[in-house]
């Protein structure tokens, strides 16, 4: 995979194949990403409704979803549970980008990955050039958001 750019603290856009752009979260030597991502706009009320395979270090370890009715993502690790536990612990050491006094949870990371996947899908991002433009825009927005809540 070719790295395209850092979107936000620990989130990277990556080129997965010739016409596929993805996003992954990195902490230490670990990566977290979503595969077979499906967004359900009609079911999204307070949060984004989605379902996906949860991938850690390149291996599908389970599935994740959000019903879209508020609250955080649900995930179920049905394989490599020790790896999932280890990565969840590593994630809990990372500060939230917008709220530095708060530590992240694996649910936060999954929801943010889903949000980035929706941006990629809705903007039909399939090229590195377009992905770089989206990275630039998202970084500008994140800086504005962080200043608002600083």
At which residue positions do the language-model features occur?
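Terminal leader/tail segments of proteins
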Residues: 2-150
């Amino acid at each position: 995979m070719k790295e395209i750019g850092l979107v936000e603290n620990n989130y990277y856009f990556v080129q997965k194949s010739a016409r596929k752009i993805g996003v992954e979260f990195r902490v230490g030597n670990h990566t977290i990403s979503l595969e077979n991502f499906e967004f359900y706009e009609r079911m999204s009320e307070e949060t984004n409704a989605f379902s996906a395979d949860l991938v850690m270090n390149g291996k599908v370890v389970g599935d994740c979803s959000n019903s879209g009715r508020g609250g955080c993502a649900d995930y179920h690790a049905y394989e490599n549970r020790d790896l999932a536990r280890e990565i969840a612990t590593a994630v809990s050491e990372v500060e939230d980008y917008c709220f530095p006094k708060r530590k992240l949870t694996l649910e936060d990371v999954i929801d943010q990955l889903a949000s980035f996947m929706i941006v990629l899908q809705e903007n039909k991002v399939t090229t590195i050039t377009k992905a770089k433009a989206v990275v630039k825009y998202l970084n500008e927005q994140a800086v504005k958001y962080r200043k608002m809540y600083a």
